[in-house]
Amino acid sequence: MRMLAVILALLVPSVADAAEINALISTALKAATDELLPPFERAHGHTIRASYGPSGALIPRFNAGQPADVFLTDSAAIDELIKEGKVVPGRTDLARTGIGIAVRKGAPKPDVSSPEALKQALLAARSLGHAAPAGGSITAPHIMRMFEQLGIAAEMAPKVRLAAGGPNGRVSVLISSGEADIGLQQVSELMSNPDVEVIGMLSAELQQITIYSAAVTTNAREVEAAKTLIKALSAPSAAPIYKAKGLDPP
């Protein structure tokens, strides 16, 4: 019995080893991390204080003093933070995703298989939802340029409904509520709403692929715990969960 107690003591993390990890995480990774973080906490005894937001909104929050041991955001933002000396060099790529097209579940599914087909579908829609540029979205500027590329910017302007961000301000909510007939957003975010159906992806000519990465901040208080978290999130065992949430291997 004494030997068993010793073995169990070695296997179970001690309170002294437990850490509170502050993590800033892009919304595109929320559905996946909602599943990945709890098992990590149970296995290691750590607590994750996760704070989510659009990629472009996370950095201002960090610069304003919000604590962060680890950043999970788009690779371009991580690279910029490394240049500024705010993140430790050597990012770990976790997954990638692209912009999907979605409608309310049960609604007619227009053809969006080519740039011309998408153009006609957008022109036929009464309203369209995408993220608000002012909210820090990295997809919004690309979508607006795409409208220009398709030659429909003027026609789309009065139809656009902007998602401000947050739990009730997502593109998927605009679609599921009926406020937007069709929506454009990173597919991992669209798939998180069961009342929304993804009907396709932007074609290669129009697509924007974003790689999401993780890195430890230079002012991290829990460096080793943050490294352990990144290792867990990039493990092969995490790949099926990313895939199920609309995220592919990097």
Region spans (language model):
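Absolute protein N-terminus
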Residues: 1-2, 18-20
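Bacterial N-terminal signal peptides
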Residues: 2-14
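Exported/periplasmic ABC-transporter solute-binding proteins
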Residues: 19-56, 60-64, 75-85, 92-97, ...
